[in-house]
Amino acid sequence: MHELSLAQGILQVALKAAQQGGAERIMTVYVKTGAFSGVVPSYLDECFTLMSKGTPAEGATLEVEEVPVVVRCLECERESQIERADACCPHCGSSQIRMVHGRECFVDRIEAE
């Protein structure tokens, strides 16, 4: 379960941002995860809740938004969203594609007071 290490990293980023902004309490952490990142949002939320106990993020809400998978075709150089890992370019049919977005996991922003 890599959600535990991701939750730890998310918590560290949120705590640092809150401290730099002079906030005492984190209310919401907004996270973006790629559709092919393998992140299970409910597991990530459970891990974040567990790891944030006793910190300014205790009780904070974790809002996870899934980012669609975007690939660039190496043949026609167009970008497209795909839903399957075995997809080809929807424009030219080439299987020569490179993922641009879809595996990321990052803190987009936080709400704190």
Predicted feature residues:
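Long, charged N-terminal interaction/targeting segments
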Residues: 1-60
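Short loop/turn motifs enriched for small/polar and acidic residues
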Residues: 32-36, 65-69, 110
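Short, flexible, mixed-charge glycine/proline-rich loop motifs
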Residues: 61-68, 78-83
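Cys/His-enriched microdomains
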Residues: 71, 87, 105
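Short cysteine-rich clusters marking metal-coordination/redox-active sites
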Residues: 73-76, 89-92
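Short functional micro-motifs and their immediate structural scaffolds
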Residues: 81, 94-98
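Short metal-binding segments enriched for Cys and/or His
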Residues: 97-109
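Long, contiguous binding/interaction regions
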Residues: 113
